[in-house]
């Protein structure tokens, strides 16, 4: 009986851990924007203002669940765009905001699949380079 309860507790713990990847997007959604003049562009742009919960994740290893956004010629890459939502609902299709996507650099190439996957890596924040996404996951590995 004791082993049964230990197995249940371990199962619940594993389930909570595996769900934590989807909670990461909820934290990353806590972002605001400020209008700031950009010299290069010659007009005001929206610059992200990261909340304290997001700032606490910077440089930390996080787990995130999401979808690979396919690009032409994609088979297996070490650099790709990752989304909280499937392709038909993602930021690039007009269905979500820029806080729902991130750039990813993996240690090993990840083969494309339409189903959600889980990645683990180090989160980098970007509020300066308007040619890049706000979030970047580096040294990432596919864990599920």
Regions found by a protein language model. Give the residues of each.
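Sec-dependent N-terminal signal peptides
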Residues: 3-14
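OB-fold and OB-like single-stranded nucleic-acid-recognition modules
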Residues: 19-144
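Absolute protein N-terminus
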Residues: 1-4, 18-20
């Amino acid at each position: 009986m004791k082993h049964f309860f230990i197995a249940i507790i371990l199962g619940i713990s594993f389930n909570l851990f595996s769900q934590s990847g989807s909670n990461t997007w909820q934290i990353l959604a806590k972002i605001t924007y400020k209008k700031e003049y950009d010299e290069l562009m010659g007009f005001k742009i929206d610059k992200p203002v990261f909340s304290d919960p997001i700032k606490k994740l910077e440089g930390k290893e996080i787990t995130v669940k999401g979808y690979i956004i396919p690009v032409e010629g994609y088979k297996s890459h070490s650099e790709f765009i990752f989304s909280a939502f499937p392709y038909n609902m993602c930021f690039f299709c007009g269905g979500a905001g820029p806080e729902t996507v991130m750039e990813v650099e993996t240690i090993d190439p990840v083969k494309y699949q339409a189903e959600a996957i889980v990645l683990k890596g180090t989160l980098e924040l970007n509020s300066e380079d308007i040619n890049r996404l706000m979030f970047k996951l580096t040294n990432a590995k596919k864990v599920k």
